[in-house]
């Protein structure tokens, strides 16, 4: 029965992963904030607000979201009040060994990966009833199967992410990337919003049904957040 559940989990996970990707975007409104509506209607009750430069994730493609409204934690915001991160200035990257370096006049980002050495990590399993969930260093993981033995351990992971903005180092906590595995440099990119002094580091890691997107946000020299999908 346990094996049947795992097979079902694999099939459904792959099915969902093959669906449409959304977009990362930030709030950009002349009032400095956007209203969150309870429903997908401008006359719907206001249940909250999001300030400018708040990072969100949603489906902008008309085929999958014809309403022009993006779902957030408490409700919906209108697409016209959002700007996709891919519309900001892109900074080109260059792969050098185990690192990819993005460098221009305002920003320098170095992302380095390394091989996964299981002897340097605490690997445990959490009983989920129908299967055992793989836990690495006490955290749930992205990019690899969440169950299994040594054959499902990752090949690599992030070693470090270093950021310099206008000559000043920006500390990126290890907790912002130490649960992410199966790194792909060729799908990494960064975007810079000069007006807000905001940097967005994007990556599309993993493969097939285990693929995931991540976006880190840094504003005015301070690490703010990440969103994983």
Q: What kind of feature is each model-predicted range?
A:
Residues 18-37:
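Short N-terminal segments immediately surrounding and downstream of signal-peptide cleavage
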Residues 78-142:
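Surface-exposed beta-loop interaction hotspot
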Residues 40-45:
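Short alpha-helix capping/helix-loop boundary micro-motifs
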Residues 135-184:
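Mature extracytoplasmic domains of secretory-pathway proteins
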Residues 19-24, 46-82:
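SH3/SH3-like beta-barrel superfamily modules
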Residues 108-110, 143-144, 197-204:
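Short beta-strand elements that form the blades of beta-propeller/WD-repeat-like
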């Amino acid at each position: 029965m346990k094996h049947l559940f795992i097979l079902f989990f694999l099939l459904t996970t792959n099915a969902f992963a093959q669906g449409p990707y959304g977009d990362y975007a930030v709030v950009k409104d002349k009032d400095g904030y956007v209203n969150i509506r309870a429903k997908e209607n401008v006359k719907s009750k206001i249940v909250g607000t999001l300030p400018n430069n708040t990072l969100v994730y949603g489906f902008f493609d008309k085929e999958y979201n014809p309403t022009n409204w993006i779902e957030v934690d408490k409700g919906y915001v209108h697409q016209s009040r959002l700007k996709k991160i891919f519309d900001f200035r892109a900074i080109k990257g260059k792969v050098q060994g185990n690192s990819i370096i993005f460098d221009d006049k305002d920003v320098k980002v170095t992302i380095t990966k390394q091989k996964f050495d299981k002897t340097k990590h605490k690997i445990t399993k959490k009983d989920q009833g129908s299967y055992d969930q793989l836990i690495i260093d006490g955290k749930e993981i992205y990019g690899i199967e969440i169950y299994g033995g040594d054959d499902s351990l990752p090949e690599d992971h992030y070693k470090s992410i270093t950021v310099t903005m206008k000559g000043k180092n920006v500390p990126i906590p290890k907790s912002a990337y130490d649960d992410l595995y199966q790194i792909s440099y060729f799908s990494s990119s960064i975007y810079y919003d000069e007006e807000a002094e905001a940097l967005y580091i994007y990556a599309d890691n993993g493969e097939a049904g285990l693929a995931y997107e991540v976006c880190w946000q840094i504003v005015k020299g301070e690490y703010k957040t990440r969103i994983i999908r």
